[in-house]
Amino acid sequence: MKKQSKILIVSHQYLPHVSPRTTRWKLIIDELTNRGHEVTLLTGTYPDFENKNINVIYFGNKNNLNIVSNLREKSKRAESKKLRTKFFYSLLKKIYRFFIKFVAWPDYSMFWIYQIFKNRNNITTDYDVIISVSLPFSSHVVAYIINKKKKKHWIMDIGDPFSLKIDAPENNRLLYSGLNNHYEKKFYSLANTILFTHKNALESHKKYFKIPSKKLVVANPI
């Protein structure tokens, strides 16, 4: 990486969403900006925080950040009203959960990918390095869309397995296991550097996807 680079970080999850991953990347971004790098964050999480040191590009619906919670709240408010209204919101919540569990690809944030694709010409391509952060895997799909023509240095940060995830898979494996494997393997072949926070995860992905050792790095968690 250059002494002072323009870095585009693609992470669907970021602050104020709290998780080990968002906390880790907040610390990394702080370190990058302290070293003089120019950082732009592309996210699907409404940036309800002061962002003096970075540029934030947000695509999403800030009025509906969590559809299930939104529907649950409306269902509660409907308790004192008509039973039919309460049933309607409860049904919508179940339909949404069914869709995310059995139909959505690659994961719950598939509509964010659509928003990025629709607005791709409005997203900056003035960067030296692009970094995509999962989970969700959608962040890597978005980075691929943006970097497809630019072909700048691509760093993938793998927080959790995608195709190799056995418990609580990100999508319907009966429908999408082939698609999962195809795109994960494709992205690993295109990325210049692939980060894993655990050596065991690195080794299992290296073996399964036949990733060259020179691309792989064990990056420290928090």
Task: For every predicted segment, state its role.
Residues 1-66, 193, 199-202, 213, ...:
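N-terminal subdomain of nucleotide-sugar transferases
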Residues 15-17, 114, 118, 138, ...:
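A short, histidine- and acid-enriched strand-loop-helix "catalytic/donor-clamping" loop
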Residues 27, 113-119, 138-141, 145-149, ...:
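Membrane-proximal helix-turn-helix segments that form the acceptor-binding/catalytic region
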Residues 86-88, 116-139, 152-155:
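Short N-terminal targeting/anchoring amphipathic segment
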Residues 152-153, 170-203, 207-217:
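Active-site-proximal region of nucleotide-activated glycan assembly enzymes
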